Amino acid sequence: MQIWVDADSVPLTAKDLIIKTAERTKTMAIFVANQPIKLRKSPLLVMTVVPSGFDKADDYIVEQIQAGDLAITSDIPLANDILDKGGMVLTTRG
């Protein structure tokens, strides 16, 4: 399992919790956004920058996510696409 983060709109408190959880559970967390987001150096944390444009980060996540992966997003259409691929979804509020 990997954690995919729709990082364009993730609040700082949620980002910090995702990072701590990924490191505690030794789970890869991939943050996807159209601009870089500062992450601490860790082999478990990856920042993926996609081109600017409507739903580019969402499209990338849907292309890459595998059944059993977890995504963190507040985007309902993205969540639906992830569920269709067998992924799991949480909002930044749980």
Residue ranges and their predicted role:
Residues 1-94:
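Nuclease catalytic cores that cleave nucleic-acid phosphodiester bonds
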